[in-house]
Amino acid sequence: MATSTGVRVSPLRVAVASFIGTTVEFYDFLIYGTAAALVFPKLFFPQASPAAGILLSFATFGVGFIARPLGGIVFGHFGDRIGRKRMLVYSLVGMGVSTVLIGLLPSYAQIGLAAPVLLTVLRLCQGFAVGGEWGGATLMAVEHASADRRGFYGAFPQMGAPAGTASATLAFFLASQLPDAQFLAWGWRLPFLFSAVLIVIGLVIRLKLTESPEFSAVVQNSAVRRMPIVEAFRRHWRQIVLVAGAYLSQGVFAYICVAYLVSYATTAAGIDRTAALFAVFVAALVAVAAYPAFGAWSDAVGRKRLFLVGVVLMAASVFPVFALIDTGSALLFGVALVLVFGLAMAPAAGVTGALFSLAFDADVRYSGVSIGYTLSQVLGSAFAPTIAAALYAATQSSDSIAWYLVAVSAISVVAGTLLPSDRSAPEAAVVKG
């Protein structure tokens, strides 16, 4: 078991490397979701009816979520045994290779039933690798930072969500400018193949990183656990459950904003799709700027306090947001998305990395935070757009969706309140008053 022997790199460089990985994670998610709606039913499930083709296509999308907790367990186990850096390289390669291969996959017309089977296998591999990305990226950023800058640097992996959203939205918008026949023939593949560029950049940076100082200390003190996953559940089962509950609102809100609201705006509110996508792009850019600002602020005022304020703001924003969207104005739809995705989510999202990771001991931290995070995604994020669509279909009112978002926010407030605070300075001093 080796620790890093290189010269220690700056916390900023580590944070940027973490940011690139989580950007790829959300970029891959969004381009797959978009392709699942627009392209995959025709290319991989042409024998099915249009409705069945869409269902089958989104079923392959859901398969990726099923694989995430398993990825979190495996990457967490080895991340707590052989190091964070090595597992982050593996997760980035796993995500990138799977995504690029999807972009190269022959269609049903070319290789028959093997096409949807291979699509499902690649989606499983992609989800497995994603399961280990966020936890490892967050730990590298937080554990390389000094105690008084953990909130700021811990926000960089969180920035990957809006950055990936903006990148994917732009990539598919540009590809969709092709004539329909060319887009269906080869244009849809371009966003998947572009993922290779992000992967190469990320690898160049990650391979030059040193191991996390806190993991190196665990190794030097001979405190590496034989079965970190077992130790995590034995000592920190409560924190795992609380992390899952605390993240629930962020995951649900994010997936509603980027996966459901565009569909809602274009169908129920009559807003032009191009304008709706542009609004997502702008809101995502606002979030990229806001997350590190709130992360830095949390280093002064306390992470848990800012997290709870953020979740309450998210809940408070939902009824005004839907009121703005229901006007049918593209401009007000943009204002609504900036309000919820760019600003209301920022206080909680900006501090999540440091708050969640530092709730666990260093020897089982990768396992604990990865399991809590991926569990929340399966229980909340994966089904959020479907639940929202079902609620609207049953009630024909956006109020039902708003109350759903308020309910998940309430769960996160309770879980966040019970989640142990980081006791390093200055958080402990702030919490104690």
Q: Each predicted region: which residue ranges?
A:
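Extracytoplasmic gate region of multi-pass secondary transporters
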Residues: 33, 237-286, 380-384
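Helix-to-loop junctions at the C-terminal end of transmembrane segments
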Residues: 72-83, 291-303
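C-terminal ends and interior cores of transmembrane alpha-helices
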Residues: 93-111, 313-328
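Multi-pass alpha-helical transporter architecture, strongest
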Residues: 202-209, 407-433
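Glycine-rich segments within core transmembrane alpha-helices of 12-TM secondary carriers
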Residues: 152-173, 373-384
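Cytoplasmic membrane-interface "Motif A"-like loop-to-helix N-cap segments
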Residues: 81-93, 300-311
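Helix-loop-helix hairpin linking two adjacent transmembrane segments in secondary transporters
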Residues: 161-206
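C-terminal transmembrane helical hairpin of 12-TM major facilitator-type secondary transporters
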Residues: 305-351
